[in-house]
Amino acid sequence: STTSSLDGSVVSFGMSPVSSESQRALDVVAKIAGRPADIKRVGPASLDLCKVADGTYDASFEPHLHEWDVPAVSAGAVVIWEAQGHLTQWNGESVHWRQENDVMATNGLITNDLSQYLA
């Protein structure tokens, strides 16, 4: 997408069925509420990443992706990179493929805008 600000963007998020892990995602949603035009909770991380890559979403974030999520996330990562998007951990570091990660994907234009809320 060409959206250059969190304001007016479309953002998706994922969360675990484990309440202690999910609370972090819900806290971020509460912080950014009112800035994006829409905040969606749709499906698996791999689908969210592909929707960022094709421009349906401007960004997606999910805390605490587990090791068993890595195959889906790594496939989605290739799609993001091919679309010139941006994929990192919430702290800005590269995703580590053999451990749990807090993942953020963006169109590359709103990374800094979103990352300030992912603490």
How should these model regions be labeled?
Residues 2-119:
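An extended, acidic
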